[in-house]
Amino acid sequence: MKVLIASGAGGGTAKKSIGKYFHLQEFGKALEKLGVEYKLVRETEYVTGFPSKNVKGWISKKKFHSLIKEYKPDIVFCDCQSHFALETIKLGIPCFTYLRGNRWMEVEWAKKTIYKDPLMKTVLEMRQKIAERVFSECQGIFMTADYLDKVIKEHIPNAKTFHFLEGLDASRWYPEEGMELKHPCVGMCQDANWWGKTKEMLTLDQVIKQMPDVHFYWAGDGQYKKPILEILEKYDNFHYLGTLDYPDGVRKYLTEIDIYALPTGMDTTPLSCREAMAMKKPIIGTKVGGIPEMIYDNKSGFLVEEGNYKAWINNIRLFLDDKELSKKIGDGARKLLLEKFNWDVVAKKFVVVAESHLAHKN
């Protein structure tokens, strides 16, 4: 079986969003262990279509068709619901897509915030129509958190959904010196790409204010960076690092922080949190979306309710004061990662689904 993997999802705290491409490569290698041939490409290098900034791509699909003709994939796996997936479907090639978050909620927040302009709203709606068609006509949707199943079925009732808890090669995540931070410290490593998710970072306003002896670091970027920095940068114990080199810069950062924090208004099973788990970091995260599927309260981290800054303060102080507890929770986080977020397990599940579809097709 030959699988063509198309990487197109944006976002992420690594420069140029390389993190998502990097981990799809790990997925491909796990497929190879099972005797499956794979090819990983960046979808925008082959097809973009309208609407996009690449005007030439609106018309020409030559590179895409050449790729398909030369590689002859049995299955195409896309992590973005855009033109690559759509053109694959048009050619009648079995296509599976991967959903990392609540796309519909992200779109609604975008309309309320950065896409208020009529033109940009139109662009957003056009992109969403393409995504809806991909969701409706593809052979199945792999989802990164169980809670997304209900979300998907609300919008695409007949969709075939499959659990796909994105893996992580824990061997790549080991202590590496090289970054100097002030201690004690709490580290965040997340993007600010839609307000429904990002606004929860403002809960830390009172946390940072009331914990002047603790330093707070944020690595990440995104269109909502400015309103966050306007509030948090007034504190001397808050430090913004921007984007980090991947994976080395992120690994050095996670090595140095004392606690990993995930304040979020909506998320699934974020990559940076899995990386922190691999590094045995004690974790505190907001109890929303798919976060409880990776942070088991009092076992692999602590969960707090949205807006509850007092819980943040109490849990941070608890971790800092009780080193034995911090180590226990950190060890529990890595153990859970190895058991649940394993590429070999994910690859086997994918192959079962793909082969079942091909057998039924033939």
Regions found by a protein language model. Give the residues of each.
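Nucleotide-activated donor-binding/catalytic signature segment of Leloir-type glycosyltransferases, i.e.
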Residues: 226-244
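Short hydrophobic beta-strand element within catalytic cores of glycosyltransferases
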Residues: 282-285, 295
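Acceptor-binding helix/loop patch of EC 2.4 sugar-transfer enzymes
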Residues: 47-50, 96-129, 182
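Conserved acidic donor-binding segment of nucleotide-sugar-dependent glycosyltransferases
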Residues: 297-298, 302-309, 318-324
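Membrane-proximal helix-turn-helix segments that form the acceptor-binding/catalytic region
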Residues: 62, 66, 119-141
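A short, well-ordered alpha-helix in the C-terminal region of glycosyltransferases
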Residues: 311, 318, 325-340, 346-352
